[in-house]
Regions:
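Non-transmembrane, aqueous-exposed alpha-helical and coiled segments at domain scale
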Residues: 1-190
Length: 190
């Protein structure tokens, strides 16, 4: 139980667990600062301001874009988006969906140009999950707990696996080919 509690407590902040909150806050900021969310030129200019750290939280990020592993597309987002579109139509949120779609199409190109990232950037599952929670009437304070609840089954499975393996030490199934390097003190690093 302590490990589960620690895992839940580690889900604080926008990096892991709070990213959909940041997307929602960013989208609200975009709506508040654009005269017309359907104006592509105005939206593109604002997205550039985000990337230059001149708008919203000044971090230089378009939240919900990019993933550490998935570059061409996040398979979770690809599947999820169909449900997002269906729910948006049912809830009468087509205008909001249109804004998300515009950002989904504009952001990767702008990020590639501004950041010189050419490996590919695509929306991740957090880009739409907060929008879905909002359409379902779920308060923002519950977004991160929902993120955690979805993982508890996996965490529990890992724990059961550990109990069944008689506490054997798990070792990586690969050998590093990187070689060794002399340690350089932190204050001496470039």
């Amino acid at each position: 139980y302590s490990a589960m509690a620690a895992a839940l407590c580690s889900l604080k902040g926008p990096r892991h667990g709070g990213a959909n909150l940041m997307v929602m806050q960013m989208m609200q900021n975009i709506r508040e600062n654009l005269h017309d969310t359907e104006d592509d030129e105005e939206l593109e200019a604002y997205l550039k301001k985000l990337l230059h750290g001149e708008a919203f939280d000044r971090k230089g990020l378009i939240y919900g874009m990019g993933h550490a592993v998935y570059s061409l597309s996040d398979p979770r987002e690809v599947v999820f988006k169909g449900y997002v579109e269906q729910l948006a139509h049912e809830k009468g949120r087509d205008k909001d969906l249109a804004l998300y779609n515009k950002i989904e199409h504009m952001a990767p190109q702008l990020i590639a140009e501004e950041r010189k990232i050419f490996k590919g950037v695509s929306p991740n599952v957090d880009f739409y999950s907060g929008f879905v929670y909002d359409m379902l009437g779920i308060p923002m304070e519950l977004y991160t707990p929902l993120f955690a609840v979805a993982r508890i089954a996996g965490w529990s499975a890992h724990r059961i696996e550990e109990l069944l393996s008689a506490n054997k030490i798990i070792r990586p199934a690969y050998k590093s080919l990187g070689g060794t390097h002399e340690y350089i003190r932190r204050n001496e690093r470039e």
